Amino acid sequence: MLEFAISAPLDTGAELLSDQVSANFPWLSLSILFPIVGAFLVPFIPDEGEGKQVRWFALGIALVTFVITVAAYLYGYDPSLSGLQLSERVSWLPDLGLTWAVGADGISMPLILLTSFITALAVLAAWPVTFKPKLFFFLILAMDGGQIAVFAVQDMLLFFLAWELELLPVYLLLAIWGGKKRQYAATKFIIYTAGSSLFILLVALAMGFFGGGTPNFEYTNLAQQSFGTGFQLLCYAGLLIAFGVKLPIVPLHTWLPDAHGEATAPVHMLLAGILLKMGGYALMRFNAQLLPEAHAQFAPLLIVLGVVNIIYAALTSFAQRNLKRKIAYSSISHMGFVLIGIGSFSALGTSGAMLQMISHGLIGASLFFLVGATYDRTHTLQLDEMGGVGQKMRIMFALWTVCALASLALPGMSGFVSELMVFVGFATDEAYTLTFRIVIAGLAAIGVILTPIYLLSMLREIFFGKENDQLVSHTNLVDAEPREVYIISCLLVPIIGIGLYPRLMTDSYTASIQELVKRDELALQRIKKPSALMIRNTTMTPAVVSSPRLPISQTRSEQLTRK
């Protein structure tokens, strides 16, 4: 008994010390810098011409980066806390107000994990690349660090730099390794994304210099500023354009089908799995969190734009005869649910938007990888030239079927849970009139109905029907190889796991989403007159009115100190 009484406090103290060390370890800086440093080491890797050593080196760097992000989640992140964790702050250029500030909360941590996971699989998907392999994997690894930085940095100028950092790798990956129209697609991508990102810089400067004095661009400082409603509306509109291009929002979407139409399979996976999520994340982080009064005014517009995305892109996808463009428009349609969830003043709806981003990242990456694998065998993307290959590629057909069912939100898959959460969250959101909710839900349901029609029709045209004699005689229709089965299996495990037990993912961000929604509900109360009749200007419950401000400056270290 005496031994137990003595050892228990020692164990508790050791555990607390271990937690403090884990929380203070620079996990996020390491996850950003490690792949970037690895990218700059790629040119020094011995290469016999086909890039075998480079492939293994890049895969090792990507896997270690994934392990670092998982370790950050397990040893430095507490899902029950809504505030900023894993925070690191180093003064960089104080005269310009620029600070190396990184951290993670429930809005960013799941996307950091998604980024490192998808990138590791994209490197494996790039195994057949033999043309300029050093440059290819250099760009992939640099893109990995830049995308993690987008989700991890806590300074708006740093965010802009990270946002721009990933543009050049994508441009080169499209322009050098793309299809016949790769130059057009790459140029269109850079014009849309680089041009729209100027709004981010202008808004960052306006918010950082607001009120005079020394500029400060950290999110913690910006969240405490009392920006006027008019100022917020201007900033919100500019950011909506910038992030709407990346999401993308119709009509700012036209770069995406062209980019997907010319990209290779690993670039597809990065575009669909990560790049589009940057737009959704930024809308949550900046528009909804830092500009709450403007968000309360713009929220109905987001919901309407979400419905337009769902219906327009679904109808357009239905009419596409090019396989890549069909899946690209399907991605745009699914991202419409993210807009509806963000536009709702419901914790369930916003949580559904977050889960939809994660779910679509996994499902979109799997579908586009299969598109690339199918093209490698058939050498065509035109559905009219396919057909009847199911007998020769049975495993490939099985993989396509499971991933297509996941995309059409089959129960038991992650897409079903996320879309259901958005629907139920918005339908029960009393910030909008019943009529508006019924109309929006009904229109969104049309897109849900169209999705299985065009996806199942696509499967029929690829694998069933009369066998194309010319296709069979001029191509090598071999079945899926072990590497391809492994990649899809890795993606299906979380897709099915989240579908069967959503709390595997939702518990990691619920606390942060609840605080975000409380902040927006308080802003809704401060608006004297609604921006549209769809918003009810009624008194919220006392629990909501008295809720605390968003504690994004609270770190895990502070929590441990209190304990």
From Swiss-Prot:
Its EC number is 7.1.1.-. InterPro entries: NADH_Q_OxRdtase_chain4 (IPR022997), NADH_Q_OxRdtase_chainM/4 (IPR010227), NADH_UbQ_OxRdtase (IPR003918), ND/Mrp_TM (IPR001750). GO terms for cellular component: plasma membrane-derived thylakoid membrane. It is a multi-pass membrane protein. It holds the Pfam family Proton_antipo_M. One of its GO terms (biological process) is electron transport coupled proton transport. Its main location: membrane. The keyword Plastid does not apply. GO terms for molecular function: NADH dehydrogenase (ubiquinone) activity; ubiquinone binding. The keyword NAD applies. It comes from the Bacteria. It catalyses: a plastoquinone + NADH + (n+1) H(+)(in) = a plastoquinol + NAD(+) + n H(+)(out); a plastoquinone + NADPH + (n+1) H(+)(in) = a plastoquinol + NADP(+) + n H(+)(out). The chain crosses the membrane at residues 25-45, 56-76, 90-110, 111-131, 133-153, 157-177, 189-209, 230-250, 264-284, 298-318, 335-355, 356-376, 397-417, 438-458, 485-505. It is found in: Cellular thylakoid membrane. Keywords: Membrane, NAD, NADP, Plastoquinone, Quinone, Thylakoid, Translocase, Transmembrane, Transmembrane helix. NDH-1 shuttles electrons from NAD(P)H, via FMN and iron-sulfur (Fe-S) centers, to quinones in the respiratory chain. The immediate electron acceptor for the enzyme in this species is believed to be plastoquinone. Couples the redox reaction to proton translocation (for every two electrons transferred, four hydrogen ions are translocated across the cytoplasmic membrane), and thus conserves the redox energy in a proton gradient. Belongs to the complex I subunit 4 family. PANTHER family: NAD(P)H-QUINONE OXIDOREDUCTASE CHAIN 4, CHLOROPLASTIC (PTHR43507:SF21), NADH-UBIQUINONE OXIDOREDUCTASE CHAIN 4 (PTHR43507). This is NAD(P)H-quinone oxidoreductase chain 4. The gene is ndhD.
